[in-house]
Amino acid sequence: VVADMILKIGQPKLRVRTGDVGGGFGMKIFVHPEYPLVVWASRTLKRAVKWIPDRQEAFQSDVQGRDHVSLAEMALDKDSKFLGMRVTTHAALGAYLSHFGAFIPTMAGSGMLAGLYQTPTVYVNVKGIMTNTVPTDAYRGAGRPEAAYLLERFVDHIAREVGLSPDELRKRNLVKPNQIPWNTALGDTYDSGDFDTVMLKGMEKADWKGFAARKAQSAAKGKWRGIGMATYVEKCSGGAPESAIAKFNDDDTISVFVGVQTNGQGHETAFTQIMSARLGVDAERIRIVQGDSDVTPEGMTGGSRSIPVAGAAVLGLSDKIIEKGKLVAASAMEASAGDIEYKDAIFRIVGTDRTMSLFDVAKAAKDPKNLPAGETPGLDGDFTRTPQAATFPNGCHVCELEVDPDTGTVEILNYTIMDDFGTALNPLLLQGQVHGGVGQGIGQALTEKTIYDNDSGQLMSGSLMDYALPRADVVPSVKFDMHNSLCTTNPLGVKGAGEAGAIGAPPSVVNAIVNAIFEHTGVKHVDMPVTAASLWAVIEANRKRKAA
C-alpha cells in the first residue's frame, strides 16, 4: 500500500525492517495513516523521522474491542439437555467500518456460540450499529471472548433456574469423546477433544469440592466468597498460507526466514525447537530471521496461527531438506537413495558405517555432479503450508474470589486453568501466553471500560488515569495445566494458544462474582466491568430494598 499507492515507487524499492514490536493484540495489524506519512516525510526531508503517538491519541483513534449487547434464549428438555438456542446481538462498529469490524461479531464470534455443547440448533442474528465512537476491531480473541462470555454466563444462569449445579448442567450437555469428530450446529467440525475430562480435571485442580469450607472461612471475616467456572473453545489457525525459507551458511549454521513476526510470543524459540527436533541439529546452529521485507516471505501474525501454520511450514521445510539431502548423500557416497537413512543430522548408508553429516551434504550439494537431474544446487529451499482446517483449542477456567460487601471490592484468591492445546511444543511459552491472556480477561471483567459523555460524545477515559488497566495486585497467580488431545488438522498436532486466556477469563470471573452475591442479594447478573463502585451500588440497592 505505502510503496505502490502513496510513494508510487514499487514494492521492491521499499524495505521494511521490524524490530521488537511488543504486544499489539489486533490493533497493530492495520496501516495507520501515520505510517505512510512518516515514510513520506523521511523521503521528503532525506533524514530519519520518528513518530511516537501519545496515550491520548491512542485512546481517541486506535481501534478498540468488544461492545456488544445480546439477548439469548435456550430451550431445554425435561432432563435439562439443550434443544436449541437463539441469540440476537447488537454489535457497535464505531463511526466507520474497520478492517475486520463486521467479521468479528458475525463469522468469528457467532460461530463459537455453539461452544462445547451438543446443542442441535443455534440461531444467531447480529445487527451492526454505527456509533459515534472509534471503530471496533480485533482485540485478543476477536469475537470469541464475546461468544464465550455470553454462552458461559447463560449456562450458569440456566443452571440456577433449573436447580442444577453449574458443573452438572455442563456435564449433561458437553460433547463426549465418542462423538468426536463433532459437527456443530453452526458449521464447524471439532476434530479432537475430551471436554468432560478437561472440565473435571480443572475442577479437581481448583479443589472445587473444598469450596464450602473456604466459603465459611470467608464468611467469618465478613466476606462473600464465590466460585465460578467457564468452558471455552476457540476456532483459530486458519487463513492465508505461511512460508519458511532455509539457507545453509558457510559456518555450518542454518538461517530460517519466516513471514510471521513475533511480538513476545517466543516464535524464535518454538521454530528453532521444531527444526532442531526434526533435523537433529543443535539449536545454536539455527537462526530464525523475521521482519525484513527484503529477505522474509509474506506472512501475518494473528489469530493464534503462527505455530499451527508457520510452524508446520518449518516442519515441512525440514522434511524437504532431509529428502533432498538423501538424494545428494546417495550420489556423493555412490549408493541408492533408498539405502540412505537419516538420524541426528547424519546421513548413513543402511547397514554400514559410511556417513555424511548434514552440513557436509549441504556443501556437497553445491557441486552439480552430486545432484540428480533437475535438482538445483545446494540444500537451500522453501516450503509453504496452506492450512487445511482450523484448530480448536479448548479448556476450563475456574475462578475463586471474595467480595467485600461494604466496598464492592473484588479480590481473586485462586485461579485455575485446564487447557487442551494439542501438542505442547514448549509448555513454558504456552503458560506465558495463557497468563497474559488471563490478565487481559480479568481487566475486561473488572476494570476496563471506555467512557464517552452521553450528551457531547466527548471521550472521558482518555488516559491511564481514567482507563483502569489491571495492576499486578489484581491479577493472581495462575495454576495452569493441560490435558491435551492431538489436533488432526496439522502435522504438528498443535492448537493455537495465543488468545485462549482472554477467552475463558471474563465469564469465569463474573460467574464467580454472581455466585458470591446471589444468596445475599438475589442478583442473578451484573454487567462487565464489575468495578468496585458498580458492585457496591448493586449491593446497596439490595440493602435499600430489604429495608423498605
Task: Tell me the role of every PLM-derived stretch.
Residues V1-I6, G226-V260, Q265:
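Conserved beta-alpha junction segments in alpha/beta enzyme cores
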Residues V1-V2, F25-V31, Q60-R66, R86-T88, ...:
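Short acidic, glycine/serine/threonine-rich loops at helix termini
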Residues A3-K8, F30-A41, D67, P241-S243, ...:
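A glycine- and small-aliphatic-rich helix-loop capping segment at beta-alpha/alpha-beta transitions
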Residues K8-R15, S42-V49, K78, I104-K223, ...:
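C-terminal catalytic domains of large/alpha subunits in multi-subunit enzymes
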Residues G24-K46, K50-I52, H267-M275:
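Thiamine diphosphate
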Residues E34, A48, R55-V122:
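Active-site cavity-forming subdomains of large catalytic enzyme subunits
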Residues H68-S70, A240-E242, G395-H397:
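Short, small/polar residue-rich loop motifs at catalytic or cofactor-binding pockets
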Residues V87-Y96, Q261-T262, Y415-G422, N484:
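Short, solvent-exposed aromatic-acidic interface loops
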